[in-house]
Amino acid sequence: MTAITQDAAERDQAQAESKAATLIESLSWLQRFHDRIVVVKFGGNAMVDEELTRTFAEDVVYLRYAGLRPVVVHGGGPQISAMLTRLGIESEFRGGYRVTTPEVLEVVRMVLTGQVSRDVVRGINAHGPLAAAVSGEDAGLFTGRRRGAVVDGVEVDLGLVGDVVAVDPTAVLAQLDAGRIPVVSSIAPDESDPAVSLNVNADAAAAALAVALGAEKLVILTDVAGLYRDWPDRGSLVSDIRSDELRALLPSLESGMIPKMAACLEAVDGGVPKAAIIDGRIPHSMLLEIFTTNGIGTEVVPA
């Protein structure tokens, strides 16, 4: 028999009550999201930090067993840059986009589908045979259209870089219906020549997929706490914002935040009830966003 002091007993009871309160707080959100699709864009530090990658996988598995239908979309910028450096291929950026030659595209495809997707799937499947990799090139999932960029008022060629202009979610829905967690890489065949593929922005791809799937929510992991109205003033963090307010604010945002907030706006405009950017550097931030009343990060809602 193990003796326990009154102070220790009271402390244990307080901790137990706190945990129970947290579980009860999540009840309404479990009801709301039950059997609903949530699209999660995985990126930033969480992709290159082993511990954050592990907790991300735990969160995704938790969503699945809590009755949600999670879909993961990922990029792989840091890994692509590292592989290009290893192969002696120069990385060039124009207007915030990676210039993508046919040689670079082969590296992009190799890293996204052969490295990053497999790593994410492996992390999730450490908890059971749940995840399956799906390339944006598979079964017409994504269709892309080439885009350029404007630098100092001049249109510049980005090579094999594009925007997602059409989504056929059949392959993803098949995985969901089989009880799996789809892990989607952001690469898309060119609409003008399907034999050629394009490097597409993962945030935008996640938004387009969320719309096509009729998702309940889009969550984008970032390396900041959320949207700041006046960066770097940390007192200007926005917890929630309407789509019309965001549309007016978008041109004035810091350049690195624009693609992520534009993706949230695209999702909400397309019928997704809510979209959020959250700090992926915080362990289990995804659970805090989905299953607590106050959430974490910045949430975008329809006007």
Swiss-Prot record:
The record marks K41, K260 as: Transition state stabilizer. SUPFAM superfamilies: Carbamate kinase-like. Pathway: Amino-acid biosynthesis; L-arginine biosynthesis; N(2)-acetyl-L-ornithine from L-glutamate: step 2/4. Substrate binds at G76, G77, R98, N199. One of its GO terms (molecular function) is ATP binding. GO terms for cellular component: cytoplasm. It is found in: Cytoplasm. Its EC number is 2.7.2.8. Its main location: cytoplasm. It is an enzyme of class 2 (transferase). Gene3D superfamilies: Acetylglutamate kinase-like (3.40.1160.10). It catalyses: N-acetyl-L-glutamate + ATP = N-acetyl-L-glutamyl 5-phosphate + ADP. Belongs to the acetylglutamate kinase family. ArgB subfamily. NCBIfam families: argB (TIGR00761). PANTHER family: N-ACETYLGLUTAMATE SYNTHASE, N-ACETYLGLUTAMATE SYNTHASE, MITOCHONDRIAL. This is Acetylglutamate kinase.
